[in-house]
């Protein structure tokens, strides 16, 4: 640009310009959708992503990425949807939608929508650096969405200027049913245990007394894990035994939740 008089403006050479209405009025939207479990946050984010021409969501669990990959494939077709986790990588040449674990997100790829699920994992001692990096740096060209617990609200407000908060109420009502023996649990029950040994021991007990149980935990291979979930969801067994990772948004048809213990050793302390 060159000024050739007090009020005249001229161009010395062609320059690349962004229309002012795009710069001011079409600023990419950043939202934080917060609330407890069973509020439809992930479902809402998936709908928003699929409404865009391209998108990417980072999940805390491989099984959650796989579950939503299957949903996206049903909506958009296998040729447009990619799955990227530490164990599985399905990336068609024409992929437009990417369902990933947070660590495996191809963050150098430009997409219209970016979502990060369970963003309160920023506070996790082992994985928090990944989720914090995504909070600070992962952005969609048209829309960015963070989903998680309301406890993360102050941190997001501090670190993400211009963020819009959306609160989601729980769909179901929780009630305490008291103590109950494992062998007397009703159908559509899940027992949550805090170690692989406890998961296998409880699953074997349920199988002996109730005829069958599915097992879900991260240590299983992707094929085995997916088969166990499918077996439960299809009604082939009425009980599920899992680690507490199942609480990170995995969508299961469960009416009753029981904890095998009330204290957990996280590798450092009880």
What are these regions (language model features)?
Residues 42, 102-110, 135, 240-258:
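SF2 helicase motor core recognition
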Residues 54-65, 145-146, 185-206, 213-216:
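Conserved strand-helix element at the start of the C-terminal RecA-like helicase core
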Residues 87-98, 223-239:
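Conserved motor-coupling elements within RecA-like helicase/translocase cores
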Residues 73-110:
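Inter-Walker segment of RecA-like/P-loop motor cores
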Residues 117-119, 261:
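Walker B catalytic acidic pair
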Residues 121-173:
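Post-DEXD/H (motif II) to motif III coupling segment of the RecA-like Helicase ATP-binding lobe
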Residues 108-110, 120-132, 250-253, 269:
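Conserved ATPase-coupling elements of RecA-like P-loop NTPase cores
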Residues 218-219, 234-238, 244-270:
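Conserved RecA-like helicase motor core of SF1/SF2 enzymes
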């Amino acid at each position: 640009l060159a000024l050739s008089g007090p009020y005249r403006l001229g161009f010395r050479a062609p320059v690349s310009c962004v229309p002012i209405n795009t710069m001011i009025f079409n600023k990419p939207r950043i939202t934080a959708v917060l609330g407890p479990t069973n509020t439809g946050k992930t479902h809402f984010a998936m709908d928003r992503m699929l409404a865009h021409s391209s998108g990417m969501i980072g999940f805390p669990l491989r099984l959650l990425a796989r579950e939503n990959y299957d949903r996206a494939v049903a909506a958009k077709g296998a040729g447009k949807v990619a799955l990227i986790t530490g164990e599985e990588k399905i990336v068609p040449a024409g992929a437009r939608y990417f369902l990933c674990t947070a660590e495996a997100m191809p963050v150098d790829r430009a997409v219209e929508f970016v979502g990060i699920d369970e963003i309160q994992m920023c506070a996790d001692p082992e994985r928090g650096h990944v989720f914090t990096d995504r909070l600070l740096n992962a952005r969609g060209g048209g829309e960015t969405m963070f989903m998680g617990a309301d406890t993360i609200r102050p941190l997001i407000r501090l670190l993400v200027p211009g963020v819009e908060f959306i609160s989601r109420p729980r769909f179901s009502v929780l009630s305490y049913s008291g103590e109950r023996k494992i062998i007397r649990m009703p159908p559509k029950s899940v027992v949550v245990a805090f170690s692989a040994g406890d998961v296998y021991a409880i699953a074997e007990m349920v199988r002996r007394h109730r005829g069958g149980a599915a097992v879900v935990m991260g240590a299983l291979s992707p094929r085995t894990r997916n088969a166990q979930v499918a077996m439960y969801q299809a009604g082939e067994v009425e009980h599920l035994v899992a680690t507490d990772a199942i609480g990170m948004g995995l969508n299961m048809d469960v009416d009753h939740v029981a904890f095998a213990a009330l204290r957990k050793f996280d590798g450092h302390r009880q």
